[in-house]
């Protein structure tokens, strides 16, 4: 789960990380009122969407008068903001964040993320913060510093100070940054985050450290422990199909291809998508129905897949361990009739009650293409869309 910048800064403040004063706004008048309350004389008008690259995309602007705030808020609110993370269609801006202007002298980058290879939290920092951090990582990776944190001790003061000094900070600024890093680590752990990123982390002309941006991702499996974070959820920023899928406990992510995939198990789902690509096709989605699929659940899965008008064929790939193949077959038959399926359907089933499931499909009278192996299934579904 993702949250907006202003919500992330609320969290950072709770953990003692310094951030500029700011007020969210949902209309132009609210934006002007927020600027009046903050007092100025310089404000930053920021689009709030769940994507990076807002500055380059024209979603972050400096205002030097209340008239500027009104003009910029009118331009940004409601725009389709296109960044390198939104895709060409962009995302509609439904809310703004009006923030005090900052005394920017030097911008740094810092983030915390779980590194699965080392099974530790990594703190990643750079002396080259700001809008072009992706380019820095690509062209000058030596400017990206990574330290791994011992889960038994957490981020200690000396390790935090080492990171601060390695990105060029010194004296009181390095001490402040080290303190911020430790507070970020506490925030990361206590909120069950999967990513905390500050870009940029600013050092002003007095050497003070302040977070000018905040990006958070949270482990959805841990949200039951954090109702206060769930309250930050903005459904307008999420894919409607993914929201609908979550109502039926379906794991769904829409992709850019034309072959719908319905699979049980995340590992098998990824292997299925890889196999489709191996044989020259492009998956239209990731869809895991899990181990407790019912006929209703499979029907809803078909409906969600087919809302994507780019889907030209569907591949159902089931391994019947906990899930019985006859239950999936019943669901497939019910779904085909319910949605009046008019695209080719390839079904591959292996495992519990496999023969019964195959017989049910064969006796259904529906034009279902059967396959015994993943390679055969992928070959047939790719051929069906060409």
Curated annotation (Swiss-Prot):
Recorded GO CC terms: cytosol; succinate-CoA ligase complex
GO MF terms held by the record: ATP binding; magnesium ion binding; succinate-CoA ligase (ADP-forming) activity; succinate-CoA ligase (GDP-forming) activity
InterPro entries: ATP-grasp, ATP-grasp_succ-CoA_synth-type, ATP_grasp_subdomain_1, Succ-CoA_synthase_bsu_CS, SUCC_ACL_C, Succ_CoA_ligase-like_bsu, Succinyl-CoA_synth-like
GO BP annotations, alphabetical order: succinyl-CoA metabolic process; tricarboxylic acid cycle
Residues reported to bind ATP: 46, 53-55, 99, 102, 107
Ranges of residues in domain ATP-grasp: 9-244
Positions that bind substrate: 264, 321-323
Tagged with keyword Transmembrane: no
EC number(s) on file: 6.2.1.5
Pathway(s) the chain acts in: Carbohydrate metabolism; tricarboxylic acid cycle; succinate from succinyl-CoA (ligase route): step 1/1
Superkingdom of the source species: Bacteria
Cofactor: how and how many bound: Binds 1 Mg(2+) ion per subunit.
Cofactor needs: Mg(2+)
Keyword terms of this UniProt record: ATP-binding, Ligase, Magnesium, Metal-binding, Nucleotide-binding, Tricarboxylic acid cycle
UniProt catalytic activity: succinate + ATP + CoA = succinyl-CoA + ADP + phosphate; GTP + succinate + CoA = succinyl-CoA + GDP + phosphate
Top EC category: ligase
Positions with a binding annotation for Mg(2+): 199, 213
Family assignment from sequence similarity: Belongs to the succinate/malate CoA ligase beta subunit family.
Subunit structure: Heterotetramer of two alpha and two beta subunits.
Function in brief: Succinyl-CoA synthetase functions in the citric acid cycle (TCA), coupling the hydrolysis of succinyl-CoA to the synthesis of either ATP or GTP and thus represents the only step of substrate-level phosphorylation in the TCA. The beta subunit provides nucleotide specificity of the enzyme and binds the substrate succinate, while the binding sites for coenzyme A and phosphate are found in the alpha subunit.
Protein name: Succinate--CoA ligase [ADP-forming] subunit beta
Gene name, Swiss-Prot/TrEMBL: sucC
């Amino acid at each position: 789960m993702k949250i907006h910048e202003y919500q992330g800064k609320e969290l950072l403040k709770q953990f003692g990380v310094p951030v500029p004063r700011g007020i969210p706004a949902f209309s132009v008048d609210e934006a002007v009122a927020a600027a009046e309350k903050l007092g100025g004389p310089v404000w930053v008008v920021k689009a709030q969407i769940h994507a990076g690259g807002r500055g380059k995309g024209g979603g972050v602007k400096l205002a030097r008068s209340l008239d500027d705030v009104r003009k910029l808020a009118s331009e940004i609110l409601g725009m389709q903001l296109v960044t390198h993370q939104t895709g060409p269609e962009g995302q509609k801006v439904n809310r703004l964040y009006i923030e005090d202007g900052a005394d920017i002298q030097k911008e740094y980058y810092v983030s915390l993320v779980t590194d699965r290879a080392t099974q530790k939290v990594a703190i990643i920092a750079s002396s080259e913060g700001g809008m072009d951090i992706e380019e820095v990582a690509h062209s000058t990776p030596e400017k990206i510093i990574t330290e791994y944190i011992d889960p038994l001790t957490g981020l200690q003061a000396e390790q935090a100070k080492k990171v601060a000094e390695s990105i060029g900070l010194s004296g009181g600024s390095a001490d402040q940054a080290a303190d911020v890093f430790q507070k970020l680590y506490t925030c990361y752990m206590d909120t069950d985050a999967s990513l905390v990123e500050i870009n940029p982390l600013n050092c002003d002309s007095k050497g003070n450290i302040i977070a000018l941006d905040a990006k958070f991702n949270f482990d959805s499996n841990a949200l039951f422990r954090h109702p206060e974070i769930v309250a930050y959820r903005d459904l307008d920023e999420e894919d409607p199909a993914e929201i609908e899928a979550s109502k039926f406990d379906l794991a769904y992510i829409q992709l850019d291809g034309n072959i719908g995939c319905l699979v049980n198990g995340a590992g098998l789902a990824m292997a299925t998508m890889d196999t489709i690509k191996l044989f020259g096709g492009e998956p239209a989605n990731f869809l895991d129905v899990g181990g407790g699929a019912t006929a209703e659940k499979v029907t809803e899965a078909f409906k969600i897949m087919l809302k994507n008008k780019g889907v030209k064929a569907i591949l159902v790939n089931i391994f019947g361990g906990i899930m019985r193949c006859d239950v999936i077959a019943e669901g497939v038959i019910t779904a085909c009739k319910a949605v009046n399926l008019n695209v080719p359907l390839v079904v591959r089933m292996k495992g519990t009650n496999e023969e019964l499931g195959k017989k049910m499909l064969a006796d259904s009278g529906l034009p279902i293409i059967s396959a015994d192996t993943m390679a055969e299934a992928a070959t047939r579904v790719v051929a069906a869309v060409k």
